[in-house]
Curated annotation (Swiss-Prot):
Disruption phenotype: Knockout mice are embryonically lethal. Residues 168-258 are annotated as: Required for interaction with VCP. GO terms for cellular component: cis-Golgi network; cytosol; dendrite; endoplasmic reticulum; Golgi apparatus; nucleus; perikaryon. Residues 61-125 form the SEP domain. Keywords: Cell projection, Cytoplasm, Endoplasmic reticulum, Golgi apparatus, Nucleus, Ubl conjugation. One of its GO terms (molecular function) is acetylcholine receptor binding. Ubiquitinated. Acts to repress the ubiquitination and subsequent endoplasmic reticulum-associated degradation of CHRNA3 by the STUB1-VCP-UBXN2A complex in cortical neurons. Also acts to promote the translocation of CHRNA3 to the plasma membrane and subsequently increases plasma membrane acetylcholine-gated ion-channel activation. Plays a role in the inhibition of STUB1-mediated TP53 degradation, via its interaction with HSPA9 which acts to inhibit TP53 binding to HSPA9. Positively mediates the ubiquitination and proteosomal degradation of RICTOR, may thereby act as a negative regulator of the mTORC2 pathway. Signal peptide: none annotated. GO terms for biological process: cellular response to leukemia inhibitory factor; negative regulation of ERAD pathway; negative regulation of proteolysis; positive regulation of protein catabolic process; regulation of gene expression; regulation of protein catabolic process; regulation of protein ubiquitination. Residues 1-30 are annotated as: Disordered. Residues 1-152 are annotated as: Required for interaction with CHRNA3. This is UBX domain-containing protein 2A. The lineage of its organism: Eukaryota, Metazoa, Chordata, Craniata, Vertebrata.
């Protein structure tokens, strides 16, 4: 497997046709390239230490289901294009037998198993908008065993009747932001890339309503813990399809003079 130096070379190597589920079928050469990529991904992941677990071997865990289709791939039924930069980095990590940095930002307290299914001869016909973990047999990625803070129910913003929707401009690029709250709850919200980090903070405050938390800051764990400048736009802060973590700010009484 040749080494990938940049995104352009990744696009050349991943010759699978990408796009929405109703895109045109692949020609013979494109299909062969797609099959080669999917097969090599399994091979490289195996060399890096990925293994298939039987149901009796598995422990309590959070699993992620990845399906590789003709026209793209899905992560727990969330459709993604092969040509997208974030998707390329995600799959390149899988190919190396590593847990993608995106998942490190989501799961930091629980073991994660990844199931990769080969569906390169099929076209993905339906998608779901929200990434959610699943339970099932999977390929464990070597040493990647992050933990999740608490078992939290996935909640979409549409389920909050008191939540004010974020105003979107459909003429501008839109991205989904996964938000992990300090209480363990998680939600997904769409923003324009021109929105600022402060808009995410405003959204969280409205989302929490009367149960508003103490003062907090926003951070991302990709590729390392980084606190965010609230004045930056999502595009400037490189937060497209990112995971944002609510970090409570500790408050303490001033030292008393003796």
């Amino acid at each position: 497997m040749k080494e990938v130096d940049n995104l352009d070379s990744i696009k050349e190597e991943w010759a699978c046709e990408t796009g929405p589920p109703d895109s045109q079928p692949l020609n013979d050469n494109q299909q062969k390239d797609c099959e080669y990529f999917v097969d090599s991904l399994f091979e490289e992941a195996g060399k890096a230490g990925a293994k298939c677990l039987s149901p009796t071997e598995q422990k309590k865990q959070v699993d992620v289901n990845i399906k590789l289709w003709k026209n793209g791939f899905t992560v727990n039924d969330d459709f993604r294009s092969y040509s997208d930069g974030a998707s390329q980095q995600f799959l390149n990590s899988i190919k190396k037998g590593e847990l993608p940095s995106e998942l490190w930002g989501i799961f930091d307290k629980e073991e994660v198993d990844v199931k990769v299914e080969d569906k390169k001869n099929e076209v993905c016909m339906s998608t779901k908008p929200v990434f959610q973990p699943f339970s099932g047999q999977g390929h464990r990625l070597g040493s990647a065993t992050p933990r999740i803070v608490s078992k939290a129910k996935s909640v979409e913003v549409d389920n909050k009747s008191t939540l004010s929707a974020v105003s979107l401009n459909n003429l501008e690029p839109i991205t989904r932001i996964q938000i992990w709250l300090a209480n363990g709850e998680r939600t997904v919200q769409r923003f324009n890339v021109s929105h600022r980090v402060s808009h995410i903070k405003d959204f969280i405050e409205k989302y929490q309503g009367s149960q508003r938390s103490p003062p907090f800051a926003l951070a991302t764990a990709l590729p390392f813990l980084r606190f965010l400048d609230e004045t930056l736009t999502l595009e400037e802060a490189d937060l497209k399809n990112a995971v944002i973590i609510q970090r409570l700010q500790k408050t303490a009484e001033p030292f008393r003079k003796l």
